[in-house]
Amino acid sequence: MVWLANPERYGQMQYRYCGKSGLRLPALSLGLWHNFGHVNALESQRAILRKAFDLGITHFDLANNYGPPPGSAEENFGRLLREDFAAYRDELIISTKAGYDMWPGPYGSGGSRKYLLASLDQSLKRMGLEYVDIFYSHRVDENTPMEETASALAHAVQSGKALYVGISSYSPERTQKMVELLHEWKIPLLIHQPSYNLLNRWVDKSGLLDTLQNNGVGCIAFTPLAQGLLTGKYLNGIPEDSRMHREGNKVRGLTPKMLTEANLNSLRLLNEMAQQRGQSMAQMALSWLLKDERVTSVLVGASRAEQLEENVQALNNLTFSTEELAQIDQHIADGELNLWQASSDK
């Protein structure tokens, strides 16, 4: 039976122009970092993608190494794209990235032209696509000249394998340099993807949003819920069904060390504020990011389709009073949750 998308899907989502480009992204985008590997049930993935699109979420964000195992998120997404979304390809924004370890040997990681372009070809093959809408340099590579990384990104566009290019976890200074390098190729930098949330404000402290605005670059925030800390699930310890319980210290992600008393106190105060606003803590955290028009979109993950419905309700209240913002700032001690600092502080 052929699946048909909700005909009213565009009536309930906000869309924002990405920097100075003509491309608009949904205020909420779906990230496939977790829950889309071969270890996850395909039908659960299908339900999440269908629900997202039915809610007007048109942007699906991947990377070469998402899984587990690495590459499996792209493979699964490609299968579901063929089975359910083939007729809707021109209504989708599909992004992928390369930068972290992907295959053995000296050419399977980093920012070299060799790695980035080979990885893009592999990603297209896994997803069954002729092009992606956005291709990212996933991280700063200290051992590769930025000129080389920029040339690879430019080639991705010139070869028709990507419509736009972006960067992730670059400092303001490196972002400015990438803008200038791509300009030499007559390729605009479309978007920057930083880790940004109520508990991790390096984007504010560093002036990154000003750099992006001054250069007409969009911003899409990842880990907007601090990888689950801002959902409220950890207020009373570590639940057995939580990612922190499952993963421990095995991967870059949540660790029990993040549950400091300062962080827990911040979370409890935020939860009280959210209730006063008639929102869940997760909804308030998303609203807080989207109150700034310089933030084009926020990337949310989901293990269940119902979570997306709750997240979309955040768009109903993006207004904060001066008193609320001051109260948030007073409550929040920066939890030092920027796990990507090794890349973004350079």
Curated annotation (Swiss-Prot):
UniProtKB keywords: NADP, Oxidoreductase
Annotated site residues (Important for catalysis) in this chain: 61, 66, 97, 138
Pfam families named in the record: Aldo_ket_red
InterPro entries named among the record's database cross-references: GAP_reductase, K_chnl_volt-dep_bsu_KCNAB-rel, NADP_OxRdtase_dom, NADP_OxRdtase_dom_sf
The enzyme's E.C. designation: 1.1.1.-, 1.1.1.2
Binding site residues for NADP(+): 33, 61, 66, 168, 193, 223, 225, 227, 233, 303, 307, 311
A GO term for molecular function: oxidoreductase activity, acting on the CH-OH group of donors, NAD or NADP as acceptor
Reaction catalysis annotation: a primary alcohol + NADP(+) = an aldehyde + NADPH + H(+)
Cystine pairings recorded for this chain: none
GO BP annotation list: methylglyoxal catabolic process; methylglyoxal metabolic process
NCBIfam families according to UniProt: PRK09912.1
Protein role: Aldo-keto reductase that catalyzes the stereospecific, NADPH-dependent reduction of L-glyceraldehyde 3-phosphate (L-GAP) to L-glycerol 3-phosphate (L-G3P).
Similarity section: Belongs to the shaker potassium channel beta subunit family.
UniProt name for this protein: L-glyceraldehyde 3-phosphate reductase
Species annotation: Escherichia coli O157:H7
